[in-house]
Design a protein with these regions (language model features):
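Flavin (FAD/FMN)-binding glycine-rich loop and adjacent Rossmann-like elements that form
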Residues: 45, 123-129, 133, 141-152, ...
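N-terminal Rossmann-fold NAD(P) dinucleotide-binding loop
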Residues: 19
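Beta1/beta-strand and adjacent pyrophosphate-binding region of the FAD-binding site
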Residues: 4-16
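PGST-rich, cysteine-poor low-complexity/disordered linker and tail segments that act as flexible spacers
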Residues: 576-666, 671-674, 681
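Short beta-strands within extracellular/lumenal beta-sheet-rich domains
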Residues: 468-488, 540-541, 668-687, 749
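Aromatic, loop-rich ligand-recognition surfaces of beta-strand-rich domains
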Residues: 496-499, 504-521, 573-575, 582, ...
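Conserved N-terminal/central alpha/beta ligand/cofactor-binding core
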Residues: 7, 25, 31-32, 37-129, ...
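Beta-sandwich interaction modules
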Residues: 483-486, 534-551, 560-564, 738-772
Length: 792
């Protein structure tokens, strides 16, 4: 046996999305980091071994909530390099983002087996807190023991191997309702968790392929075994999976009984394929299909939850509690899975939608009694039902990024984790996260060395909301429809709507105010009326809206169903968005809104939305089919123009502290253009400045959320992102210098080191996008020279 001892500033155990984001974030800030993973690949539940598609905060109740920061960088890299979204390509992206960082050493196939601790204050007999000194991991492939020493550790392992070995306090199972006043919990606590799943993938071989169930699968499934809540014949996607509900094991110990649980879930999964292939209504269609891949590693949902100085609860999430130490956000609903899994004939999941995004405090991301141990992922300090929301992978990625930044600041300030709660240090963490394009819901963070707000802003043009461009087709008002609008005036006179009328008819409509918490659903009715519409094509009808605007921001126009009316569909900037009603679903109840968004699939007879509903597709026109490839990512609305015109896309919007829609779009948008001449925006100061860095945040269509199955896309980049741009610096001596010229950008967050002096004006010129005919920019941050911190 070989023994190797390693010394680092920060050791991250667990190579899922939380661990990757923690390690990369720390490393990019100069921290020498080890990433220790017990599997041969990175990615955790999203890896090619398990293949659970990552999901997060993007929900119909708050449309523009996709996670940004490091996970957005990963997704945009993956789209560019791996547009087919293959699991192999995804794993290559994950490994590349780690191996490309010079401050990270990656240790794959290294399983932690021992954690060494010491008493933190050995001179104080009353102090029971411990400190992790080292973790020991074994690599069987190389017959080598690795001992990792560091001042700080992060347990991102899911089950919490470091926390458990260190003696960190933890909880397991479902609390009683009275413990945290959580109404969904049982009266008495239970030692039950959510179970584990295996995925499978089938492929069409083009010739008949038989399947015979192995003898060791000692049961056979038929239609009745699926019950009313697992309509496998309706929701089976042979090429991409769709088997999250093949779940079991929550009544066992999801740590120590993992092998037993995996064996049973494997039996269930193969038995399901046997039914689909040989006896189901799909059997004839699946004659030429074979089982292409079957997961051998179960995807886990829940096991240990380690106690921090705050336990996140249902109330914190549903009430959107304000935390001074907020470092990340979530938005997935309370998604509880019954412990019995597949063998329970009840709902495989009950998903209660949230009113709005919620924040997660740093106090839930470290151990209460281990002074140098962070947690990120599904093992954080949260109640069982709170975890049913925060456990999803894109939220876990946000937690990892926050922990990586907290570790950087703990080392910078040479302090304990708990000392980071001091106001100055917490502000530094939040600013560092903001700089990394990491979002904290409801926080108006600015960078201390950002001088953009001191400048005068000018632009080549500003989108006024009148010219929405080509129509993509029409949508019949066979059901109610809704339009999101952004209102910034104190009143409005009317809304001009483009439509066709098959007969003389009456169009009824209502105007609503949205919630104050940035959610995108109607809450308070302000006006209701109706207008007569004459038979005719391509009409622009004025809808009077006679009301005072109390709260500026999101408002909603609801069209009552009228089968004689067809509304025109256009592509639009953020802040204009169309919705349709979703039938009540007992598995996925939404107490706040009946409205949801449609994920457009041009050419299909039905379009599936992000929440699983199926509705008839619009009548797409020739222009739509010509632009089908980019349509999936675009922001679509009905052709509605508010009067007086709402100037919500002005150049000054790049100075606001938000780099995403909140209750406003918060971005500069140019007028429609062919880009024959560049669209530009500039910042000018009264006196010369010394500029260290320039950061641009482009629009990457945050209303879109990447597929919940491993399907591919027909483009390599988000169509709203500026593809080619140039930065010019106008100097105090009257000269003009080109600072940077990027010809094939596909990223949202673009940071450029400049180190230039005597600058009076910075000008961003946009020459092309990846599809749309406008330039759309959230932020242009100009960062003055500040002190750099390095670590040895």
């Amino acid at each position: 046996m070989k023994n190797i001892q390693h010394h680092y500033n920060f050791v991250v155990v667990g190579g899922g999305l939380a661990g990757i984001c923690a390690a990369v974030t720390a490393a990019r800030n100069g921290i020498r980091t080890a990433l220790v993973q017990d599997r041969p690949v990175l990615g955790g539940n999203s890896s090619k071994e398990i293949r659970v598609p990552p999901v997060g905060a993007t929900q119909c109740n708050f449309a523009y909530s996709r996670e940004t920061g490091l996970i957005e960088e990963l997704f945009l890299n993956n789209l560019y390099n791996n547009p087919t979204w293959s699991p192999e390509g995804w794993n290559l992206e994950l490994e590349s983002i780690v191996r490309n960082e010079p401050n990270i050493d990656l240790f794959l196939n290294c399983a932690v087996s021992e954690v060494k601790t010491v008493k933190y204050d050995r001179y104080n007999p009353e102090c029971q807190n411990l400190k992790v000194v080292s973790v020991k991991a074994y690599c069987a492939m190389a017959e080598t023991w690795h001992i990792f020493k560091a001042p700080f550790f992060a347990d991102c392992s899911g089950d919490g191997i470091v926390g458990s070995g260190a003696g960190a306090f933890f909880k397991y199972g479902i609390e009683a309702a009275s413990e945290y006043n959580e109404p969904f919990c049982p009266e008495e606590s239970k030692m039950e968790t959510m179970g584990m799943s295996l995925q499978l993938k089938a492929r069409d071989t083009g010739r008949p392929i038989p399947f015979k169930k192995p003898k060791w699968i000692d049961f056979e499934l038929n239609e009745a075994d699926f019950g009313p809540y697992r309509p496998v014949n309706e929701h089976f996607f042979p090429d991409t999976g769709g088997f999250w509900w093949l779940e079991w094991g929550g009544e066992l110990d999801t740590v120590h009984d993992t092998i037993q649980i995996k064996d049973e879930v494997q039996k269930i999964t193969i038995a399901v394929w046997d039914y689909l292939k040989n006896r189901s209504p799909l059997a004839e269609k699946l004659i030429t299909y074979e089982l292409d891949w079957l997961g051998a590693v179960p995807g886990k949902r829940e096991s240990r939850r380690f106690l921090g100085d705050h336990v996140l609860t249902m109330g914190d999430i549903s009430e959107q509690f304000h935390f001074e130490d907020a470092v990340a956000y979530g938005g997935w609903g309370f998604d509880h899975h019954p412990a019995g899994g597949f063998h329970d004939k009840i709902n495989p999941s009950t998903h209660h939608y949230l009113r709005g995004p919620h924040n997660i405090p740093l106090r839930s991301l470290y151990s209460k009694n281990i002074v140098n141990l962070f947690f990120a992922g599904r093992n954080i300090s949260a109640s069982h039902y709170a975890l049913s929301s925060t456990r999803v992978m894109l939220t876990c990625a946000q937690l990892g990024e926050a922990v990586g930044m907290a570790a950087f600041n703990a080392i910078k300030y040479k302090c304990l984790i708990k000392n980071l709660l001091e106001a100055e240090k917490m502000k530094a963490i939040q600013q560092d996260l903001f700089k990394a394009d990491h979002h904290i819901h409801g926080y108006n963070t600015t960078l201390s060395n950002d001088i953009s707000s001191m400048a005068t802003v000018n632009a080549s043009s500003e989108f006024r909301g009148e010219n929405l461009g080509e129509t993509w087709g029409t949508e019949p008002l066979t059901e109610d429809r809704m339009q999101l609008l952004t209102i910034v005036s104190n009143y409005i006179d009317y809304i001009k709507v483009r439509l066709d009328a098959e007969e003389n008819t009456v169009l009824s409509y209502a105007f609503f105010q949205g919630p104050a918490n940035a959610s995108t659903f109607p809450e308070k009715e302000l006006f209701r009326s109706k207008v007569e519409v004459k038979k005719g094509k391509n009409q622009r009808i004025d809808l009077p809206v006679l009301c005072e605007i109390i709260n500026k921001g999101w408002h909603f126009l609801i069209f009552d169903a009228n089968p004689d009316i067809n509304l025109y569909i256009v592509e639009s900037p953020p802040g204009l968005l169309r919705y349709y009603p979703r039938p009540f679903d007992p598995i996925r109840p939404n107490q706040f809104s009946k409205w949801t968004l449609r994920s457009l699939q041009i050419g299909q007879q039905k379009a599936a939305d992000a929440d699983g509903a199926m509705v008839a597709a619009p009548s797409w026109n020739r222009f739509a089919y010509e632009n089908k490839n980019i349509s999936t990512f675009l922001n679509f609305s009905f052709d509605c123009v508010v009067h007086p015109l709402q100037m919500v896309y002005e150049s000054k919007m790049i100075l606001n502290p938000h780099s995403r829609p909140t209750n406003m779009p918060n971005l500069w948008v140019s007028e429609k253009t062919s880009f024959k001449d560049s669209e530009w925006i500039s910042l000018t100061w009264e006196k010369p400045r010394e500029i260290e860095r320039i950061q641009i945040i482009f629009d990457s269509s945050l209303q879109f959320h990447f597929s919940q199955s491993w399907q591919g896309y027909s483009v390599h980049a988000i169509p709203t992102i500026v593809k080619e741009y140039k930065i010019l610096a106008c100097m105090a001596d009257g000269t003009e210098n080109e600072i940077i010229h990027v010809k094939n950008n596909y990223k949202r967050n673009c940071l450029h080191e400049t180190n230039i002096k005597n600058v009076l004006t910075i000008k961003l010129l946009c020459f092309a996008t990846h599809g749309i005919e406008r330039a759309q920019v959230y932020s242009l941050r100009i960062l003055e020279k500040s002190g750099n911190t390095t670590f040895s």
